């Protein structure tokens, strides 16, 4: 039986849930939807992208340790460039500028406060 497969929701390990929530909200434009330091987990979103932020105590039984790498697939080279410009104007920790890679991805990388990485990309192999 075929099922419509939903988007994955990555768990991002952080050391300070309140500081991480503020960074994702203020610098990267996410919304903190629920949770926080008291729960050890928070749900954040931006458009159709959803993620969980979790602190050390919450992760203790599960073994998810930083840093992690998350790929964010956008719909065009222009969207990648626009998001880079937006995040460059904030205090986002830009690791690399947008670049067309030999493997046919136009991408840049940003880090959070804990060194987790986000590679923002567009696959231009079919353009």
Cite the ranges covered by each PLM segment:
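Vicinal oxygen chelate
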Residues: 15-18, 70-117
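N-terminal beta-strand motif that seeds the catalytic metal site of vicinal oxygen chelate
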Residues: 1-21, 68-72, 123-127
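Conserved acetyl-CoA-binding loop of GNAT-fold acetyltransferases
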Residues: 26-33, 89-92
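A short acidic/small-residue loop/turn micro-motif
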Residues: 40, 102-103, 124-127
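C-terminal "cap" of GNAT-fold acetyltransferases
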Residues: 2-7, 15, 38-51, 109
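Conserved short beta-strand elements that form part of the metal-binding/catalytic scaffold
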Residues: 31-66, 117-122
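Short beta-strand-to-loop elements that line the ligand-binding cleft
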Residues: 10-12, 33-35, 99-100
């Amino acid at each position: 039986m075929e099922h419509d497969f939903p988007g994955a929701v990555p768990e991002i390990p952080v050391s300070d849930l309140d500081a991480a929530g503020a960074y994702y909200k203020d610098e990267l434009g996410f919304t903190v939807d629920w949770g926080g330091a008291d729960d050890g987990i928070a749900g954040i979103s931006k458009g159709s992208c959803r993620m969980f932020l979790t602190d050390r105590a919450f992760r203790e039984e599960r073994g998810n340790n930083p840093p992690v790498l998350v790929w964010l697939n956008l719909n065009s080279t222009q969207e990648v460039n626009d998001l880079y410009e937006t995040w460059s104007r904030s205090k986002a920790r830009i690791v690399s500028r947008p670049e067309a890679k030999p493997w046919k991805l136009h991408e840049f990388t940003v880090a959070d406060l804990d060194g987790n990485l986000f590679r923002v990309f567009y696959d231009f192999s079919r353009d």
